[in-house]
Regions:
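Membrane-embedded architecture of ER/inner-membrane glycosylation machinery
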Residues: 3-6, 14-15, 22-43, 236, ...
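Membrane-integral, polyisoprenol-dependent glycosyltransferases
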Residues: 2-431, 451, 602-604
Length: 614
């Protein structure tokens, strides 16, 4: 039998199974697909998704390099805290210049070390506002803002970077912690956390709220990691980040941590764990971080203890001294709004965690029925439930209530939600819950599209065209979530919910940020005053809102006097007054010449030039 010669295959570069897909290209995409499906590749993809969304929600419209600094400092707290950090930095630079030193000594000689110590202490101990001590809050925010000022210059957006960077650290560390201890729902939890209304809002504020919530939450996760593993290493998180939170807002941080841990261990009857939590190296680390500043500021300001601990902690909780009274149910409303658009899912996850915890507690207090845990991690829902609920319940009894007080409750609720979504992936999300989540997302879309109509144009009834577009887009967002949830399952719910949120943030800041700036910040007013009077004249005010006064003080870097408090300056100056109060000028400026420079109609203000007293 004669062998039949087989055809010789052509060279590989000429033979392709799919002419439209060359082998090299197919090989690249096949390798990429295998990589993304591997544990390492999926981790890289998840982390990239997290960084992209976190960077967008925390920084877009905040920095000049990313959407522009769209909104100036708003409210009274933001410009006040930003100005304190600026004055502390100026005092610090002056003191360092006087001793010809930096924080890092030039050498190990005693004189250089002493000079560096004087430089370190100069301007960093006592918070100062308009040259006087301001002792309402500890110094962590001011220190961090000083660092960003030195790096990027003094600006409103650099004053907000301490909160944005603290939030980013919280999101990343929470993601890594959950990936290590609760894999599966870690990406959902992190994305829910970074996109909730409360986190997005406070992460963009030049305030102390996120300086407390972020390290406090990281420390609590560290404590539970120690509880589950028994490794002392994790207790460093509790004490280190607990100290940072104490330097941010004072004794409320260790108080909340102690109460939550005490409740958790008490309900589990594990009192020995409470004793083991008191770890000497951790306690020493905490004291080494906290005591130097508290001792130093008390020595330099003998009234600090009374003003800070008593007035701004005890009296603030026990009374309505600072006029922040709200009804008892106030934080229920704040929670509903702060968790948007994830409110329905978060409340369902909280109820699920609460049901699990109650069942555990009932079984635990019935010894004959209690057979123990299947795994050590079963206690995590109990811990998260107590962590989420205690600040809400505790501050509901406070005489003063502000939204930021319950910010530490948002991270555990986001974690509960992410874990809940992971656990129901196989069974699927109940239709009523999917529909409710879609309605909440559609409602958020509808309301935020109408926001410029209410906030900028002050329209009770919005323009019909805008109302129609808001309704259509709100319904479209809801239907999109319902379709994806039913067709592709729970796994894709997180990303499809992010689509309208991403567009809404661009709409609010990218398209309407300048309008919000004109109506709610003093920055445009300060710019207009600077253009009209480039000589840097003194500015005074009469019957102007506190946020405008503090805002002008920051943007002009000068104290803004008040006619009703400090009197009328004798020198030439600029006066800012509500337009409807202009008839008071004759009373305050008898015999003085003055003329109107311009009207700032968006905030109902008039600006006058007042000539020197003759």
């Amino acid at each position: 039998v004669t062998d039949i010669p087989q055809p010789v295959p052509p060279p590989h570069d000429l033979a392709a199974a799919d002419p439209s897909a060359p082998i090299a290209t197919r090989g690249f995409f096949t390798s990429l697909r295998h990589l993304t499906r591997s544990d390492f590749g999926s981790s890289i993809v998840e982390f990239a998704i997290l960084l992209i969304f976190s960077g967008y929600f925390l920084l877009y419209g905040l920095m000049p390099y990313f959407g522009g600094s769209q909104l100036g400092l708003v409210g009274a707290d933001e410009p006040r805290y930003a100005q304190i950090a600026r004055e502390m930095l100026a005092a610090h630079s002056t003191d360092c210049h006087e001793v010809h030193a930096r924080i890092a000594p030039h050498s190990l000689r005693p004189n250089d070390i002493h000079a560096s110590y004087e430089c370190l202490m100069g301007g960093t101990v006592t918070p100062i506002l308009y040259g006087k001590p301001w002792l309402e809050k500890p110094a962590l925010y001011y220190w961090r803002a000083m660092g960003f000022y030195k790096e990027f210059g003094v600006s409103d957006w650099s004053a907000r970077l301490p909160s944005a960077s603290a939030t980013l650290a919280l999101i990343i560390l929470a993601f890594l912690h959950l990936r290590r201890f609760r894999p599966g729902g870690h990406l959902d939890a992190a994305l829910i956390m970074v996109s909730s209304v409360a986190i997005v809002a406070f992460a963009r504020g030049a305030s102390t709220d996120m300086q407390l919530a972020a390290p406090f939450s990281i420390g609590m996760l560290g404590w539970y990691a120690w509880y589950e593993t028994g490794k002392k290493f994790w207790l460093f998180d509790l004490y280190f980040f607990g100290a940072a939170a104490t330097l941010a807002k004072g004794p409320v941080a260790p108080f909340l941590a102690f109460c939550i841990i005490l409740l958790f261990l008490g309900l589990r009857r594990e009192w020995s764990a409470l004793r083991r939590t008191i770890w000497i190296p951790g306690v020493l680390l905490y004291l080494a971080m906290v005591l130097p500043w508290y001792i130093a500021v008390q020595r330099r300001n003998p009234t600090f203890f009374h003003e800070f601990f008593y007035e701004h902690n005890v009296e603030r909780f026990a009374t309505d001294l600072y006029r922040h009274h709200q009804p008892f149910y106030y934080y229920a409303v704040v929670l509903v709004v702060g968790l948007l658009p994830w409110t329905a899912l978060s409340f369902r996850a909280l109820v699920d965690g609460l049901q699990t915890s109650i069942a555990e507690w009932k079984a635990r207090f019935t010894p004959r029925r209690y057979v123990g845990h299947v795994r050590a991690g079963d206690a995590f829902p109990e811990f998260l439930v107590l962590w989420a609920l205690f600040p809400i319940v505790f501050f509901s009894f406070s005489g003063s209530k502000l939204p930021g007080y319950i910010l530490p409750s948002i991270p555990p609720l986001a974690i509960l939600t992410g874990d809940y979504l992971f656990r129901i992936r196989r069974a699927g999300i109940p239709p009523w819950l999917l529909n409710t989540h879609a309605i909440f997302t559609g409602f958020v879309t509808f309301v935020l599209i109408l926001c410029p109509q209410y906030l900028v144009y002050q329209r009770i009834v919005p323009a019909p065209r805008i109302f129609g577009w808001a309704a259509v887009l709100g319904v479209a967002a809801a239907l999109l979530i319902i379709f994806v949830g039913r067709r592709f399952g729970v796994k894709h719910l997180r990303l499809i919910t992010m689509v309208p949120l991403t567009a809404l943030l661009y709409f609010l800041l990218g398209r309407n940020g300048h309008l919000l700036d004109l109506n709610y910040s003093a920055r445009p007013l300060a710019r207009q005053i600077a253009q009209a009077t480039p000589d840097g004249a003194t500015v005074a005010c009469l019957d102007v809102r506190r946020d405008i006064v503090y805002g002008l003080a920051f943007y002009r870097n000068q104290f803004i006097s008040n006619y009703a408090v400090q009197g009328v300056p004798d020198d030439a100056h600029i006066l800012v007054i509500p337009t409807h109060d202009a008839d008071q000028l004759q009373h305050f400026l008898q015999g003085r010449l003055y003329q109107q420079i311009f009207l700032y109609e968006t905030q109902g203000l008039s600006v006058y030039k007042v000539y020197p007293k003759t």
